Amino acid sequence: MYHSIKRFLIGKPLKSQAAGEQKLTKLKALAMLSSDALSSVAYGTEQILIILATISAAAFWYSIPIAVGVLILLLALILSYRQIIYAYPQGGGAYIVSKENLGEKPGLIAGGSLLVDYILTVAVSISAGTDAITSAFPALHDYHVPIAIFLVLVIMILNLRGLSESASILAYPVYLFVVALLVLIAVGLFKLMTGQIDQPAHHTSLGTPVAGITLFLLLKAFSSGCSALTGVEAISNAIPAFKNPPARNAARTLAMMGILLAILFSGITVLAYGYGTAPKPDETVVSQIASETFGRNVFYYVIQGVTSLILVLAANTGFSAFPQLAFNLARDQYMPRMFTVRGDRLGFSNGIIFLGFASIVLIILFGGQTEHLIPLYAVGVFIPFTLSQTGMCMKWIKQKPKGWIGKMLINSCGALISFMVLSILFVTKFNVVWPVLIFMPIVVLLFFAIKNHYTAVGEQLRIVDKEPEEIKGTVVIVPVAGVTTVVQKSIHYAKSLSDQVIAVHVSFDREQEKKFEKRWEELNNGVRLVTLHSSYRSLVHPFDKFLETVEAKAKKEQFSVMVLFPQFITKKRWHTILHNQSAFLLRVRLFWKKDIMVATLPYHFKK
């Protein structure tokens, strides 16, 4: 049943040789890895206007120079990450760059920031998309969290089916969103230039002095507008997912994403200024622009529909980049090794599943209202932005390749602007982003704890010249609850392993104890029976004390100790709950006894 459902949802397993077929073309990669960045167009301009609106609508013209500043940062980031892609074609992005050029701790800070950011990406994007759905269908408002969880599971399953297949499905809505917004911008600009739009009374021309405007407020608006740049780094983390040559294809995809993002963001910002659009609590800026441009007709609803869809699909960037980044960290032993294992469909399925359930936990904890996580989301991006650009500067200074000064200037510009935005975010939104100062050290400490564990394990597993202690034999202990054919087979097998076999029975009743001893004598199997009476009906405690005694004597004689458990394997799985799980309790207890071997002898029921 389980396997049938798994095959239906995820598909048939793929051979390792088919890994090349799961690689992404540039167009598929653009849809898979750029959905987060492109979706930010839906709210980037609005975030700027919300800050400017605290002064007055007359300040809206500042959105144009602020947008220019955002575009300059976008250009710096695209050029910088293009250099990272060619310098580190194995992927890893900010984590690898920071670790190799700035040191272990900066690398882990960058990697940890991105891991947390991808979890936030999924939670925030899905919640935003769910908001759009429940706004269109108010009757579903009470089911906000279940809908969000369902959407996370759908995208998780699509990614478990493999990169290529999920990209083929998700490409359509992403490109539909791009085309719809390009049409909106083109028609809107045409109407502006031909005077078909009536500008509101509060509309002011560029350069008009505005009372009360401050540098602090403009910087705050700029940092809010930089939310449009979230997701730019995803391509550099997932270079191995591209078809050959991966670095060149990734660089071209990054350039395509940058061009599209610049056109869409600047187009929406210009239209918002030209139309005099003011942010409203019950209607988005994009919705107002579409309504003003087309009226409430079919195309308006198409734009609203694809905008809602792209907000949901923005989560897919996290599902594409998180597993690859987790693989890089796990390969360096900073995360559990399970993140290096490919699943049935050749994706890093453990990373995909972990991300899905971590984001579901966030959605449940915040009741689906994750808007106040957006500043954390932005900080989580600009920390690795700053570290990776600084790391690249150090790389060029150390190596001094041909043309290194120009390359260093590009990365220096990116590092400086990213650091400025990060500083502005901390200064202007400290009351929201302060948790970063707590959870990032915790994440880094967790990385070190995992690394220390693997290092300690490696030291203990290393073969040394010292000869191991000679073992003269083994004492095999067989716990028995009754005189059955299962016990007979277990005793017979134990005797094939050693001459030193002891059967142990824990009794709660004196009369039953005597009856059991009598039946054991009748078997005449030549194996000594030890009966342990438990006055307090504890199975584990008397057995544990007996083992301590046997273990102490065995050590003196240079004997090892093995406990052999007979185990029932029922024909139907649900039958298992009908049987006493005492053997399981004893086994769990023995796992922590380092000098005792534990073995299980299964007995399969036929009916």
Curated annotation (Swiss-Prot):
Q: Which residues does the annotation say bind K(+) 1?
A: 36
Record-listed K(+) 3 binding positions: 117
The record's subcellular location field reads: Cell membrane
Identify the keywords attached in UniProt to this record, alphabetized.
Answer: Cell membrane, Ion transport, Membrane, Metal-binding, Potassium, Potassium transport, Symport, Transmembrane, Transmembrane helix, Transport
User: Which Gene3D superfamilies does the entry mention?
Assistant: Amino acid/polyamine transporter I
Q: How does it sit in the membrane?
A: Multi-pass membrane protein
Topological domain ranges for the Extracellular compartment: 50-62, 135-142, 191-214, 272-298, 367-372, 429-431
A GO cellular-component term linked to this record:
plasma membrane
Instruction: Tell me, in a sentence or two, what this protein's role is.
Output: High-affinity potassium transporter. Functions as a K(+)/H(+) symporter.
What is stated as this protein's family in its record? Belongs to the amino acid-polyamine-organocation (APC) superfamily.
Name the UniProt record assigns to this protein:
Potassium transporter KimA
Source organism (scientific name)? Bacillus subtilis (strain 168)
